[in-house]
């Protein structure tokens, strides 16, 4: 039995920084074209922009939480869906290094989710997201017989409400507490 099983998103994150990423604040014009905050992160269109060394990490609600729990000494598993690709392999390798059991589901239909985080010098960020396999976790794929834990932690991203509800109902029927992070 695990202390905690995390269920939800797993992504390959790429952090990019550059002094050439500029923040533009122009309420008069930006709100008119759909920028609700009246702010935009900008760089020259068509340019070649120098960046600092890219940082590649594992991200996503389920994997980030699993690493946190494992580092605190909890026996942890992560139920995630990834693609059969290098990014998925990298995520699995990191979870092994962090002593996390993976209840992984792999698919050829979608690649592993990716996020590219553009960090401006001021610390503000813009995130480009490909949700990939993470949002495609289906109810019929969940190995309910393996959800043996003292706690479940659910960070679903865009996993369907029906799937999340069934997992919560399953946990409630077995008196397993659930922590829910709607992402």
What residues fall within each predicted segment?
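Cofactor-binding loop segments of dinucleotide-utilizing enzymes, especially the Rossmann-like FAD-
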Residues: 7-9, 81-84, 107, 119-121, ...
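Glycine-rich phosphate/adenosyl-contacting loop at the front of the ribokinase-like
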Residues: 1-77
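Anion (oxyanion) recognition and catalysis
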Residues: 70, 96, 172-173
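A glycine-rich helix N-cap at a beta->alpha junction
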Residues: 94-111
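Conserved phosphate-binding/catalytic loop of the ribokinase/pfkB sugar-kinase fold
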Residues: 103-107, 117-161
